[in-house]
Amino acid sequence: MTAAPQPEDHHAAVIYNPIKVDLARLEADVAEAEAAAGWGTTQWYPTSVEDAGQSVTKTALDQGAAVVLAAGGDGTVRGVAEALRDSGVPIALIPSGTGNLLARNLELPLTDQVASIGAAFTGVDRHIDVGIAEIERADGTSEEHAFLVMAGLGLDAKMIALTNPKLKKAVGWLAYIDAGVRALPDLKPVKLRFSIDGAPERTTSVHTIIVGNCGALPGGILLMPDAKPDDGVLDIAALKPSGPFGWVKVWNKVAWENGVLRKSTLGRSIIDLTSDVKDVLYATGTDLRMTVEQPQEFQLDGDEFGEAKSVHAWVDPGALTVKVPA
């Protein structure tokens, strides 16, 4: 059944990573959905090395786009969302990357491009939170960026920085395991000061600290089991394993307990009977400030963002509208 025609200027925009997508197929699928919905002609904007999506999305907004389709990896989605934050114009996800982290956490189609595009034109709106990170460098300069899934400092960011792009293209998220193995020999605890929601500052040493708007990673890893993208708070996980056996306990916690046992009533009962793992610490809050003794690698949604001396992260509740299947 063909939808009622929309005003001629009612159109979508597609922000796409030309390296990640099959452009001819994408154009054909969008044209079909656009016609079925009775929309005007879709506008197309490629990303580039200089622009992950922020600038072209602002252009699309200036041109009156009613919905913006993000076709690319996690970096493209993050860039588009950064520009759409608090605009009221929805984003539609066309997963085309390695991790597809936000789509995975929202339980959206990962491999059905036609269904993903259809949601852009006929789906319903879902409002989710956006994490904001202000990053201060060692030279005193600072910059502010959005994140949708996780921001991390320490080991996880170092793993991302060390990931082999060719291996990542060949085996996907498994390339991070190779990077982690290479990062471990030189790994030292990160000494930092932190404050959550304005509480008195505390000092600790961790191997990595992750601030999450969502909790799931590829491979069935549920790092933050209580994280929800629309609960108005950020979840914080600190990994501080004591020796090699500590890393085994960390893996057991996030892969087995969080990823498997929590999915059943019996499994949750087993977790309740076991002692809590001190190598993985959890907290929640709306505002986190942390300063490290020495600059550390920092990442946002799986993309490296250089070294940070301090980070101020907070949540912008309900700031992003996402199109999901009706």
State the predicted function of each range.
Residues 1-68, 78, 118:
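ATP/NTP phosphate-donor binding region
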Residues 2, 196-199, 228-229, 238-326:
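ATP/nucleoside-binding phosphotransfer catalytic cores, i.e., glycine-rich phosphate-binding loops
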Residues 18, 71-73, 94-97:
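Glycine-rich beta-strand-to-loop/alpha-helix junction loops that act as flexible
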Residues 47, 85-90, 96-211:
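Catalytic core of DAGKc-family lipid kinases
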Residues 53, 75-80, 99-101, 128:
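Short glycine/serine/threonine-rich phosphate/pyrophosphate-binding segments
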Residues 152, 156, 210-225, 304:
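Glycine-rich phosphate/pyrophosphate-binding beta-alpha loops
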Residues 167-175, 219-220, 225-249:
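Gly/Ser/Thr-rich active-site loops/lids in small-molecule metabolic enzymes
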Residues 188-190, 205-207, 230-235, 286:
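A generic structural signal for short beta-strands and their flanking turns/coil linkers
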